[in-house]
Amino acid sequence: MTSKVNKIYWDSTAFICFLKRMEGERRKICEDILYHARDGNVNLYTSTFTITEVIRPQTVDVAGTRLISPEEIADIQGMFEWPWVKKIDLDQRVARKAVELERDYGLSTADSIHAASAVVAKVDVLQHWERKDEFGKISRLVAVEQPRMLTYRAVAQMPNSAHNRLFRTAAAMVGQQHLRLRSRP
């Protein structure tokens, strides 16, 4: 059973939480939403700008001081090629809306791009894991929340075997961690 939310926008923090094993519960919630997107129960959107934000922090947060390799970058970029993650191009229309939101609501440039992408795509909700609530400023334009489980009575702890069978289209490598992304049974 899924929520009545059909169109979800993720900013970069949701993807980063999905990639990091240490995120625990947040990561499980992101996996649940990705399952629902993969299975066609919800439509998941993000900006093409998200790709740069997701890969850039990995150089410090996950991989230590070394730069991530071109192969690691390609593996992470593969996540953004999943057909169930719909990309919103940072085009003239989104850029104009971002400028307006930055001016009117005092959002950072990055947050204004995400907010503008969500507004232009007419999503039901913009989801993010940020500690600050910058997106709350635009809640009259689009609903804003932290990602949440969509599966009714979702288990609090996914068995290891469930994670090993996760998703079918890519293998994302973050630093020394390998996340196998395959279909679940």
Regions found by a protein language model. Give the residues of each.
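Extended, non-globular alpha-helical segments
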Residues: 74-79, 86
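Acidic, PIN/NYN-like endoribonuclease modules and their adjacent C-terminal/linker elements
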Residues: 1-7, 36, 115-185
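PIN/NYN-family metal-dependent endoribonuclease catalytic core
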Residues: 7-10, 28-64, 82, 86-90
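Internal catalytic-core helix/loop-beta-alpha segment
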Residues: 96-100, 104
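Conserved glycosyltransferase catalytic-site signature
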Residues: 12, 48, 92, 110-115
